[in-house]
Amino acid sequence: MIFEEFAKSDCYGMIFTFMWAFNQQSDWDYVEHIKDIFRPYGTEFYYVELMASQEVRLQRNATENRLRHKASKRDVELSNQRLLQDDAKFRLESHPGEIPFANYLRLANTHLSPQPAAAKIREARGRSLIPYPDPTGEAAHPL
């Protein structure tokens, strides 16, 4: 698996995206599984939850860049149907305070293009981190 190989490497930083169904224990377990792969290497994790309205997500679903880079989105009608079905079936936005992990940012990006959203993430990443309680026992800091 790519995560295991990357964890062992000397490479700096990995970004991956994941549509997290917060009402599915299997998704919480998957996140813990990924953390378990990297934990022996002392990896620092940063979590960014991007939130956009359904209308905007449907618009973004058909952009040239997305269609070029994501084969699964090229059948726009099918992709839009999946988006609507997933929205009806899963809770895809966390509740405030629900994410107990260190270095977490919840970013509403309905009105942000990718560049300003990335700038906000970089800005949050660069802030001094202030500890807060973490029920998992790990060091916890908000972004």
Predicted regions and their residues:
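Glycine-rich loops and low-complexity Gly/Arg-rich segments
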Residues: 1, 38-43, 71-75, 130-134
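Small-molecule kinase domains that catalyze NTP-dependent phosphoryl transfer to phosphate-bearing small molecules
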Residues: 63-117, 132, 137-143
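Short, amphipathic alpha-helical "lid/cap" segments that border enzyme active or binding sites
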Residues: 3, 114-122
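C-terminal alpha-helix
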Residues: 120-131
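Switch/connector loops and helix/strand junctions flanking conserved nucleotide-binding motifs
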Residues: 54-61
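Residues that form generic nucleotide/phosphate-binding pockets
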Residues: 5, 60, 124
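Short, glycine/charged-enriched secondary-structure capping and boundary segments
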Residues: 29-32, 61-65, 120-122
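Glycine-rich phosphate-binding loop used to anchor ATP phosphates in small-molecule kinases
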Residues: 1-49, 54
